[in-house]
Design a protein with these regions (language model features):
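Short linear, low-complexity motifs centered on an aromatic residue
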Residues: 126-139
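Short helix/strand-capping turn motifs
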Residues: 1-121, 139
Length: 139
C-alpha cells in the first residue's frame, strides 16, 4: 500500500545518493514566479528501494476510493541527470503510463492533476520527444 496523505507523493526508489535526494526534494518545493508550488510528501522509505512502475501500480487497490491517482518517483535517472527529470506514473486512467517532469514544472502537473483540472494525458502528450515535460509551448 501507498502511504495515506492529503498531498501528492514523491517516492524515493533509489538510495544511492542522500544529497541528491535532499536537493531534489528542495527543488520541487520552490514556488513558481506566480507563487504556485507542488503539495508533496517526499517519502524516503527503504521499502520502495528499486520499486518498478509495474510494482507501484500493484500497490494501488483495484476499485473503490483511491487516495492517489498518480505518483511522482525519484528513481536513479531523477537523482543523477542534471535536469532532475522526475518520473510521473498514472495510477488511474492508464495505470503504468509514464512521463517525466523537471522540478520547475512540477507545481503545474501536481496542482492540476490533484484537483482533476487537467488530465494526465494532457501533460504526457505534451512531453518533449525524450519523454520529459518542460512546460507547455508558448503561443
Amino acid at each position: 500500500m501507498l502511504p495515506k496523505s492529503d498531498n501528492s507523493l514523491l517516492l524515493r526508489t533509489d538510495f544511492s545518493d542522500d544529497a541528491a535526494w535532499a536537493a531534489l526534494c528542495e527543488a520541487v518545493r520552490v514556488p513558481s514566479e506566480e507563487g504556485f508550488q507542488a503539495h508533496l510528501d517526499c517519502i524516503s522509505d527503504p521499502v520502495y528501494d528499486g520499486l518498478t512502475v509495474e510494482q507501484l501500480v500493484t500497490l494501488v487497490p483495484k476499485g473503490g476510493d483511491r487516495d492517489h491517482v498518480f505518483a511522482f518517483v525519484a528513481d536513479r535517472i531523477a537523482l543523477t541527470e542534471p535536469e532532475q527529470p522526475i518520473l510521473v506514473v498514472d495510477l488511474y486512467d492508464e495505470p503504468g503510463r509514464t512521463f517525466r517532469v523537471i522540478p520547475r514544472e512540477m507545481w503545474g502537473v501536481e496542482n492540476n492533476l490533484s484537483i482533476a483540472n487537467m488530465d494526465y494525458s494532457e501533460f504526457a502528450d505534451n512531453a518533449d520527444p525524450d519523454g520529459v515535460f518542460r512546460g507547455f509551448p508558448q503561443s
